[in-house]
Amino acid sequence: MKRSTSSAKAVVIGAALVGSVPAFAQSSVTLYGIVDNGLAYQSSSTSLGSTSGGHSVVKMTPGVWAGSRFGLKGGEDLGGGTKAIFQLESGLNSGTGAAQYTNALFGRLAYVGVTNASYGTFTAGRQYASYYQLLSPYSPTTWITGFYGAHPGDIDGLDTIYRANNTLEYTSPKLYGLTVSGSYSLGGVAGSVNQGSTWTGAVQYAMGPIGLAVGFSRINNSTAGGGAWGSDSTTTNGGSQVGVSALTNGYQTARAQQRFAVGGGYTFNSAWDVTATYSNVQYIPGINSKFTDTAIFNTGGVVLHWKPAVVWDFAAGYSYTRATRANGITDSASYQQFNLSQYYSLSKRTGLYALEAYQRANGKTLGTNGAGQIIDATASIGDGFNSTPASSASQFAFGLGIIHRF
């Protein structure tokens, strides 16, 4: 009898202890990544700002189709349809093993937030701004890659190189095909809410075979009145200005960069789809800038994608960029770019690819010294050649590679 009573007490106590343990929400963490290595040929390569001394080059180039990376992402169910989310992503040179950013462990992405299907998503940290998030489905980089296929120098920020620090971002739930998003990146400059800040907004409509988006962004230099790009500027590439290329080298000292873009796409059937974009980009001077007139670049582009079989993808793209006459330039620069891509899927995660690109530049632009240095415009394919443009008006590039996603 005593033994039976003791057993009963043990069961009761055990049940009480179990009942007193809080019910923790379900959570998950996923490790993911991309390793991409290729062999690339470039017909002319020189240092940024040079218009002579270019030579052809063949080299191993990582991240030609997609930047090599690894990351962690996950979430926790908070109840009521709300989840906490986070993402940490680090870039790397898969040819050498070196980190993409020497001063940032998770230089690609580092944010945390909450999401709810009825109320939308709010995130805080280093991330892509709303401008890119909603325009990216119609970006040329989807099928002809940013390395070769971004509009010259990624002039309009439609590739993934533009990330902003200290960003607060809200994206609405999709309602009747419509999504709205806005982001603000705090510059953190004492005495100013404007210096170094980045703010963007975008609207997207996607329903059935049709997709459309429009976006605007304003990137402010943290250096008052323009000048050398301040380290406190929220939109940075390892602490330096993003997207400096042969197109924009003479406008690095801008007080602000302003972008407006429209993109759209149409899916004809399972084999064919097309996307198109237009952008207006302005480099706005300040009292300390090395140029005096706003530099404006208008770009239009189109990409046709064909999938004849499950394992094959082919794409062709064309873009035209033209600068306005300003800062003493009467023959303004223009850039025509042609792209082809071929992708063969070995599996859902692994593929082989080939890429070809040609760009032709015409007219004049500013050199490193700004308005005091008018030079011939030189070619700079996509954004993979921002630091190694051609020394002449034309440039051809060809790449072969393998990519694996995990």
PLM features: residue spans?
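Detector for outer-membrane/organellar transmembrane beta-barrel domains
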Residues: 202-345, 356-358, 393
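Flexible, surface-exposed loop regions and adjacent strand-edge segments
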Residues: 49-51, 102-105, 140-145, 229-235, ...
